[in-house]
Amino acid sequence: MTWWRWWLAFAAALPLQAACNLLNTWGDERSGVDDVPGAIRTTPQVHEGCVSMRAVLAAAIGCVVVSGLLAVPLFAVPAHDGGFAFNWPLLVISLVGLFGACNYATGVKFKYRGLGVPFVFFLMGTIEMAGVVCASCLEALGGLAWLAILLVSLPVNCLVAVIMHGNDMRDIPSDRAAGIRTVASVLGPRGALLLYYALHLLPYAMVACCFRLFVMCRLAFLPQALWALLPLAAFPLTIRTLHTATRVYCACPENPPWRGLERASGGIHFVFGLLYALALALM
C-alpha cells in the first residue's frame, strides 16, 4: 500500500460525492419534490431561482470531470516486468460509483423507487472502501481480501445509510404528497423508527462480535484486540439521538415532526468512523 495513492483516491472521491449531491438537488427540483406545500427545501437557492438548474448541472458535470482527472494515475499499477498494468478492478468500481451518482435521483431514480437506503448502504460504504483499497494496493486482491472489505465496511454502511434514512423520515409527509416512494414513506413512522434504531445499533453489535471473534480465534493478543472496542465510545451519542427520535414519535405518532435526525446521525457517523479507523490502524 502506498500512501500517496490513498490520498489521491480520497481526493478523487470528494468531487464525485459532490457531483452526486448536486445531481440529487437537480433531480429533486426537476421532479417537483420541493413544490409540495410544507416541503423542507435543503437548497432553497435553486428553488427560488438564485442558482439556475443549468449551473447546478454544469457544476455536477465539472465535479465528475475533476474526479476522473484526479483518478487517472491510480489506474496504472507497477507490473512484475518493471512496466505498468491497468487497474481493471478500480475501473469497474469507478463505473459503478459513477452509475450510482447519475441514477440516484436522476435517470433510473433509485431514490424515488424505495431503493435509496439500500442503494446508499452499499454504494457509500462497501463500494467506496473497495475503491480506496483497489487504488492503494499495488497487488491483486484475493477472495479473502474482498470478503474482509465487505465485512469491515458493514458498520460504516449502516451509519451512512441511517443519515439518508433520517432525512427520509423528516420528509415522509411531503414525499407521500409528491407520490414518492422512500423506505421511510413505505414503512410509515413506526416502521421507519424501528429501522432507524436497527441501523444505529447494528454497528456496535458488529464491533462486539469482531472483538469476540479476535479473542476466540486468537487472531490478536487480548490487549491488541481491546482496540476493537474503541468505537463503543460513540455509544452515548447514539443513545441520545435515539431518545430524541423516540420522544418526538411518542408526542405525535401519526405525523412525528422529526427534525435534525440526519445531522445527529452524521455526527455519530463521523465520531464512530474516526474511532473505527483508529481501531483498525492500531490493531
PLM regions with names:
Residues 1-26, 89-102, 144-166:
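Membrane-embedded alpha-helical segments that form the functional core of polytopic membrane enzymes
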Residues 15-40, 161-184:
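Acidic (Asp/Glu-rich) catalytic motifs at the cytosolic membrane interface
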Residues 44-141:
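Intramembrane alpha-helical segments
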Residues 36-82, 180-224, 263-272:
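Multi-pass membrane catalytic core of lipid/isoprenoid biosynthesis enzymes
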Residues 120-172, 178, 190-193:
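Functional transmembrane core segments of multi-pass inner-membrane proteins
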